[in-house]
Structures are given as structure tokens and as C-alpha cells.
Curated annotation (Swiss-Prot):
CDD domains, A to Z: Ribosomal_L18_L5e
GO biological process, one term: ribosomal large subunit assembly
Gene behind the chain: rpl18
Protein name: Large ribosomal subunit protein uL18
Sequence similarity: Belongs to the universal ribosomal protein uL18 family.
GO molecular function, one term: structural constituent of ribosome
UniProt function note: This is one of the proteins that bind and probably mediate the attachment of the 5S RNA into the large ribosomal subunit, where it forms part of the central protuberance.
Subunit structure: Part of the 50S ribosomal subunit. Contacts the 5S and 23S rRNAs.
Keywords, sorted A to Z: Ribonucleoprotein, Ribosomal protein, RNA-binding, rRNA-binding
Classification lineage: Archaea, Thermoproteota, Thermoprotei, Thermoproteales, Thermoproteaceae
Coiled-coil annotated spans: none
Any GO CC annotation of this UniProt entry: cytosolic large ribosomal subunit
Length: 207
């Protein structure tokens, strides 16, 4: 941190709103892996990071882009259901690397009760990863299952078919009727769980 007179220039990443060094120091000192969740304009990204004297190491990583490429996800890549599925994926991957607990690292993002951040946490916890948090901040099951999207789509389709086609054009182009998104979420969730169940079975057989 540079200084001149009474004014101190903050570290670049703090000025850019990327790193809270005070919170980061506390988490690094704890020695526990960190569950880092970030959002871009289109995607959800989750990482499990371990800090060492040499620097930070990414142990596991998952993104909503992978949901499309590897698990056939047809829904939006930045919404609450996608965030939940990313959490499920990062949870299984962390466990496969021997990580059983991770501390949530929200960076400088504003924490909102029931938001996408906690949808990721819920997914990771459902996978079996321990992430200390208050369960009251988790999104409702209706939002995790996409029922709010399905209901809105069904109502809009009936009241304004043209707007329905415009609003859900990407869903429809991929072959998914948004009214059926809850069923699709369960299908993708099953694919993720099945993949890692097989991975665990192979690991046990090799021992």
C-alpha cells in the first residue's frame, strides 16, 4: 500500500472492488479451504481455494458454462437454478479432492438473503460439502427448483403469447419450454449426481 503525506493509496485489487484484504487475511490465517463464488454477466463460477505460503491454489472449480457443455443444461446460465447446480457440482468435486469443509468467501459482493450466492452454497451442502452458514439465507425450494420461472412462463404464455416468445426465446431455441424447467432441473441434477456416484464407486473399487 503506497502512501504520501496523510493519504494512503489502497491496494489495486481493493480499489477495483475485487479483494477485501482484511477478510481475506482472517480466512487465510484460519487455514481452511475457501469456497469462492463469483458472477459475470452470463455465468456463475465457483472455486474451492487453498492458501499456502507459496500462494493460492485452486483445488476444484465449476461454472454454469459447464452445465451446458457437459450436462445438457438448456436453461439460463446466470439464474438461481443454475447457481444451485453449480454448487452441487463444486461440492462433489471438492469432496473428490478430499475437501470436506470450506469457508464461504463472498469477496466484496453484497450478500442478499435468498440470492444466487446462497443457491451455490445450498448446492454444495446438498452434495455433502460442509459450508458454515445460516440456513435462513438459503433460497426457497420453489426458487431452487425453478418453479417461479415455470409459473411466470405459464402465466405469460396464456396472457401474452408474443411476449412469451420474446422473453423466453433462448429457452425455446434450445428446445426447452420454460414451463417444464423444474423437470429439466431434476434431470440435470440426476446426471451430476450419477456421474459422481460412479466416480466414488470406481475409487472404492481401486482401493
Amino acid at each position: 500500500m503506497a502512501s504520501s503525506g496523510r493519504y494512503k493509496v489502497k491496494f489495486r485489487r481493493r480499489r477495483e472492488g475485487k479483494t477485501d484484504y482484511y477478510k481475506r487475511r482472517i480466512m487465510v490465517i484460519s487455514g481452511k479451504p475457501r469456497l469462492v463464488v463469483r458472477f459475470s454477466n452470463r455465468y456463475v463460477l465457483a472455486q474451492v481455494i487453498v492458501s499456502a505460503p507459496q500462494g493460492d491454489f485452486t483445488v476444484a472449480e465449476a461454472s454454469s458454462r459447464e452445465l451446458v457443455k457437459k450436462f445438457g443444461w438448456l436453461g439460463g446460465t446466470g439464474n438461481t437454478p443454475a447457481a444451485y447446480l453449480v454448487g452441487l457440482l463444486i461440492g462433489y468435486r471438492a469432496l473428490s479432492k478430499g475437501i470436506k469443509l470450506a469457508v464461504l468467501d463472498v469477496g466484496l459482493h453484497r450478500v442478499t438473503k435468498g440470492g444466487r450466492l446462497f443457491a451455490v452454497v445450498k448446492g454444495a451442502v446438498d452434495a455433502g460439502l460442509e459450508v458454515p452458514h445460516d440456513e435462513e439465507v438459503q433460497p426457497s425450494e420453489d426458487r431452487l427448483n425453478g418453479e417461479h420461472i415455470a409459473q411466470y412462463a405459464a402465466d405469460l404464455k396464456q396472457s401474452n403469447p408474443e411476449l412469451y416468445k420474446i422473453r423466453f426465446s433462448k429457452y425455446l431455441a434450445r428446445g426447452l419450454e420454460p414451463e417444464n424447467i423444474s423437470k429439466h432441473i431434476e434431470e440435470v441434477k440426476s446426471k451430476i449426481m450419477e456421474k459422481y456416484a460412479k466416480s466414488e464407486a470406481k475409487a472404492e473399487d481401486s482401493q
